[in-house]
Each structure stands twice: as C-alpha cells, then as structure tokens.
Amino acid sequence: MTVMAPRTLLLLLSGALVLTETWAGSHSMRYFSTAVSRPGREEPRYIEVGYVDDTQFVRFDSDAASPRMEPRAQWVEKEGREYWEEETQRAKAFAQTFRVNLQTALGYYNQSEAGSHTIQMMSGCDLGPDGRLLRGYDQHAYDGKDYISLNEDLRSWTAADVAAQITQRKWEAANEAERTRAYLEGTCVEWLHRYLENGKETLQRAEPPKTHVTHHPVSDHEATLRCWALGFYPAEITLTWQRDGEDQTQDMELVETRPTGNGTFQKWAAVVVLSGEEHRYTCHVQHEGLPEPLTLRWEPPSQPTIPIMGIVAILAILGAVVTGAVVTAVMWRKKSSDKKGGSYSQAARSDSAQGSDVSLTACKV
C-alpha cells in the first residue's frame, strides 16, 4: 500500500495562534475518510466528513454533481474562497491516493477485482482543558478491520496483520510518522483552536438534558424502568441505575448516544425490576450542562384528586336535576294541553315519547 497523502495538505494558518485560552473542557477534531471500490467502474466512491466535537462541519462526496468540500455548519461558512478551494483540492488528492491504495491492497490480500472493498481512515487531535494537545490519532482500516494505526507516542505504528506490515515498513522508511506527528501537534491543534473560536456559540455551549423515568410492565411480576435523557449537548453523558445505592451496570440495557436532528442528543438506560420494588431503584445522570448530578426515581401515577364517592355524589345530583327538568316540562305541557283541546293533546302525548326532543317538537306549532 502506498504512502498516504501528506497530512500537511490541510490549509495552514497565516499566522501562529497564541495557545493561552482556557476551554470549558476537552475538545476534538476528526476527519473520517472512506473509499469504496465498485466493480465495473474505474473510480471508487470517496466520502470525507469533518467533525469538531460532536458537530459535523464539512463534507466531500466524489459522487456529487460537482464534487467540492462543502460546509455543514454556519460558523465555518465565514472561511474565505481560498479555504474552500484548498480543501476541495486536498480531498480530491486523497480520493486518488485511496484509489491507488485499494488496488494495492488487492495484491496484498490476493483478492480479485470482482468484489467491492473499502478503505477507511480517521485522523485528528484532542485538546485538553488547557488548550494543548491531549492525544493524536491516525488510524486505517481495510474491509472493516483494523489495518494500521499510529501509536500514542506519535512516533511508531502498529500493524494488524502481515499485509499491514508491508505498509508499516514503507511508512517507516519514508518517515511518515514524523510528518503525521507534525500535522497533529501543529496544524490540527491550530485549526481546532480557530474553529472553536469561530463557532464558540455552538461548540462551547452546554445544554443540560431533559430527564424522566418511564415504567413498562413486562409480565405479572416484572417491569422495565427506562431512564431518559433528551436534548443535551455535548454528547458526552453518563446514565447509571442503582439498586439500594449499588450500581446495576451489569444488568442495564444502555443504548448508544444518538443525535436528535437539531444539534442535540438523546440516550436512555433501562433495567428490569420485580414489580413492587421500583422504589428501590434510582437513575443517576451526569452531564456537563448540569450544575450537579441528577437522581431520578419512577413516580407512580398520582391518585385522582376527586374521590370516587365524590364523583358518585355529583352524578347523583346531576341525575336528579335532569329528572326534575323532565318532570317539569311534562307537567307544563300537560297543563297547556288541557287548555287547548283534544287534537293538540294527542300530539303532545305522541311527542312526549321522544324524550329530550319534547321541547323542540312543542315549538313547531
């Protein structure tokens, strides 16, 4: 597999940034690149997306009508025309490098061109609360399996199999680790600082989760308690169930944090409990947007505020009022009938059998 495109292809800052600002917490920048070969077509599809923390900010797709690096966040749109031109050219160069790497990998693994194959890469950097590099990443995969990755020292590689060892030897001979380290410690950190400043209203906000617990009967003797956290940012959150103060991590069902589509996230954790023991379980929520961790319990539905006997009494009173009204109407009509004669009296008796329509019929004289 040939040497990957130099990491210095990212647009460099025109001037050095002073790394003295203190951030609310740790932050990260990641680029995820994927190339998929397609039998019968010369060019594989290449897709690249960039993230700052949990926010996608750029995207490139070689299958687009006019392939270009495109903004996915408002705060990056303020970058000038030169930025987008350089980023587009860099992505296109990576697409060609990945195309060559796919062909090379076929030889390494003795595979034919009849099938579809995939190369993936993730590169990026983490900043600590002090704004300095916490960790750098450069990881590669082939057909969904680890291939080669840069070690935490940013000076050496770990190859996952014999084929990857060929790449490792090539990269060591070309001092690829040194160039990658220079990008991670320099360009990556500088651009992440720039993005955090330009998008601080979005990237450095902390929206606390909206939380509640739901109850779902499983059988006559068991129920599921589900602890919900909705609408929070950033995505990092901890949900834990406890029984009488002891963690129930082994017995929990926990879903991965999911985007809600509006820039926030959601997550839930569930535990199965014996019916009648729900009060022994508490859900504990920790998130950057909370002033302190939350403790939640399932609260059974409250009893009706009006007692049953009160409802019965009200219904009885209403019944008496309606009955009295009907009796009064009938007596009034009988009295009117006696005054006006026989033929109308017969009509009145006939109408009286229509119940609540009596008064309406009486008006049709």
Swiss-Prot record:
The chain crosses the membrane at residues 309-332. Residues 115-206 are annotated as: Alpha-2. GO terms for cellular component: early endosome membrane; ER to Golgi transport vesicle membrane; external side of plasma membrane; extracellular space; lumenal side of endoplasmic reticulum membrane; MHC class I protein complex; phagocytic vesicle membrane; recycling endosome membrane. Keywords: Disulfide bond, Glycoprotein, Immunity, Membrane, MHC I, Phosphoprotein, Signal, Transmembrane, Transmembrane helix. Residues 346-359 have a biased composition (Polar residues). Residues 25-114 are annotated as: Alpha-1. Glycans are attached at residue 110. Residues 333-365 are cytoplasmic. The keyword 4Fe-4S does not apply. It comes from the Eukaryota. Residues 209-297 form the Ig-like C1-type domain. GO terms for molecular function: peptide antigen binding; signaling receptor binding. Involved in the presentation of foreign antigens to the immune system. This is Class I histocompatibility antigen, B alpha chain. It comes from Saguinus oedipus (Cotton-top tamarin).
